[in-house]
Amino acid sequence: LGMTSPDSGSISVFGHAGCSAKDREDIGVVFDELPFAQTLFISHLGRIMKGIYQNWDQKQYEEYLQKFALPDRKELKDFSRGMKMKLSLAVALSHNAKLLILDEPTSGLDPVVRAEILDIFLDFISDGEHSVLVSSHITSDLEKVADYITFIHQGKLMLCENKDNIIYGYGIAKADKATIDAIDSQFVLKKKHGKYDSEALVIDRAAFSRQYPEILVDPINLDELMLMLCSDK
């Protein structure tokens, strides 16, 4: 988006390096906080966006406002968090974006609004021509809508994996320390030793169970996975 420069590494957008003005036309962004002037009305905002985006679709914007039941006689400062998030989505979805980038879009929302927003994401990507990049700490939401999980901890990339591989393939093996330490490293991503027992983060629990039928291995959810990867024991 041109808001900051990387310290290292590289990034490609739509298959090429960098992000041109044309690329930014194809990206819809939803920040954690509403980035618009708080004294605006939603009708004013539509006129402003029309002057910013070449592909602005006013009719689509108005349809989203109606769908989200957003009030047209309130200033933005009087909107609830859920209403502000819906408005940000309405803007992001009304200029024919191919990619949505969202920062904590469901944080602080009630379950009904969260479910509604997740359904919007699923509908957006349903044609296979659109993508959504979500930054979120709500792992249950990621389990519902994500295809891939990228976990970054303290600026370090800890994991980038297909979500289904994690849910249906990864697991936690539990046993005494000697048993866990004896497991072949090809099966293990991380080991953790506690006071009374030890655990291993297993990459392929089906293959692991064939190799070690005597060791119990359970499925793992995203919360458990992230806690395991962050463990320093």
Language model region names:
Residues L100-E104:
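Catalytic Walker B motif of ABC-type/P-loop ATPase nucleotide-binding domains
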Residues G9-D23:
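Conserved ABC transporter NBD signature motif
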Residues E25, F31-L87:
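ABC-family P-loop ATPase nucleotide-binding domains
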Residues V188-K233:
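C-terminal coupling/interaction segments
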Residues L118-V202:
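ABC transporter nucleotide-binding domain
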